[in-house]
């Protein structure tokens, strides 16, 4: 796969709409050409202890952050500024370029639910899953198929796991290798 956006969300609590950070990496012709990271004020705006233990984020990080619709539009504008796939209406994600995530079921659900939460029109994104792809590609040769394990098998050193941009970068690397 040569053209895609690798995306990763971290959530504040058990609600899929509670995205508190986003990382995205644009890959064109097999090369990483741009990336984006932002904190997001989650909705609902509360943190579960378990989630904080995973990613280390809390109210002190996101109380002054923008809500999702503003971050999404800024991401599209910044990530795709040099690319001709962005429509004039930056509220619409170009669905011609697929999204890639490790455990895409989680990230696609987060995206769908946060769009629903803010009553944004949800385009039918095409998602590819590096978790599912790694199970086929490595066929039982890995201890597990967690992001850091698969990234290492693909030659990528993921040093800041559960930081949304670091995870999106690892996902992009994996996708370039096995999709």
Q: Which role fits each region the language model picked out?
A:
Residues 114-118, 136, 153, 174-178:
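Active-site catalytic microenvironments for nucleophilic, acid-base chemistry
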Residues 1-117, 124, 144-162:
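Conserved non-catalytic scaffold segment of RNase H-like nuclease domains
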Residues 79-81, 129, 139, 175-179:
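Short alpha-helix boundary/capping motifs
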Residues 163-176:
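Acidic, divalent-metal-coordinating active-site segment for phosphoryl/phosphodiester hydrolysis
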Residues 128-144:
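Short alpha-helix plus adjacent loop in nuclease-associated cores
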Residues 11-13, 132, 170:
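Short, glycine/acidic-enriched loop or turn micro-motifs at the edges of active sites
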Residues 107, 126, 167-170:
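Catalytic-loop motifs flanking and including active-site residues across diverse enzymes
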